[in-house]
């Protein structure tokens, strides 16, 4: 009789809930085997659900593939709302029908998985472009315009250049066919890829800023107006990376 460890190894091979081999395992009444069966079935169901989710996230891309368009760039930004730091945009072209497990709107991905999924996107992508506009540009032209400039910069860095843009809730003044998608990072795999690239890039920048400007917890809050961040402003004042057109920074520097 196979050991429970050996049974687990054999179960790991199964990918289909209708596989006839399940029957032989189910005849084994050992508690450990029955627990392993339940665990493997649950894992397969999760894998099937993930596959279905990724297929749904490719709906926009598949409609473009059907028209013969293959160089599709997803475009997204991170950092519109913080009181400090830049706005960062990313543009990502993935291979046709590419699926990256766990890829989603970066806000829905556990922080512990950000780096691994970012690395997978960077490995799989046909091209990646990143655009960064600092707080001085944001204060000069406003955050909406700075976001568009960052997106355009990211797209212009792509090589090859895309045939079509899928953009998260934005229209850009570029001679490239584009589709603006509300909540695009949750509805397009290409935009989700751009979302995680922008997120990880900006988080790394804010972690570096924490070393330069300790006391504001930038690595933890990414420049958002948390209690700890506001306490840092009260204690140490406004830094060179704070957005002076944003409240409460705007009022503080007027005092």
Curated annotation (Swiss-Prot):
SUPFAM superfamilies in the cross-refs: Ribonuclease H-like
Binding site for a divalent metal cation: 76-77, 168
Known catalytic reactions: Endonucleolytic cleavage to 5'-phosphomonoester
EC numbers on record: 3.1.26.4
Cofactor: binding comment: Manganese or magnesium. Binds 1 divalent metal ion per monomer in the absence of substrate. May bind a second metal ion after substrate binding.
Gene Ontology CC, one term: ribonuclease H2 complex
Superkingdom, natural source: Bacteria
Keywords: Cytoplasm, Endonuclease, Hydrolase, Manganese, Metal-binding, Nuclease
Cofactor(s) named in the record: Mn(2+); Mg(2+)
GO molecular function annotations of the record: manganese ion binding; RNA binding; RNA-DNA hybrid ribonuclease activity
Matching InterPro entries: RNase_HII, RNase_HII/HIII, RNase_HII/HIII_dom, RNaseH-like_sf, RNaseH_sf
GO biological process, one term: DNA replication, removal of RNA primer
Subcellular location: Cytoplasm
Every RNase H type-2 domain range: 70-255
Family per similarity comment: Belongs to the RNase HII family.
PANTHER family documented for this protein: RIBONUCLEASE H2 SUBUNIT A, RIBONUCLEASE HII
Role, per record: Endonuclease that specifically degrades the RNA of RNA-DNA hybrids.
Protein name: Ribonuclease HII
The species this protein was found in: Streptococcus thermophilus (strain ATCC BAA-491 / LMD-9)
Gene: rnhB
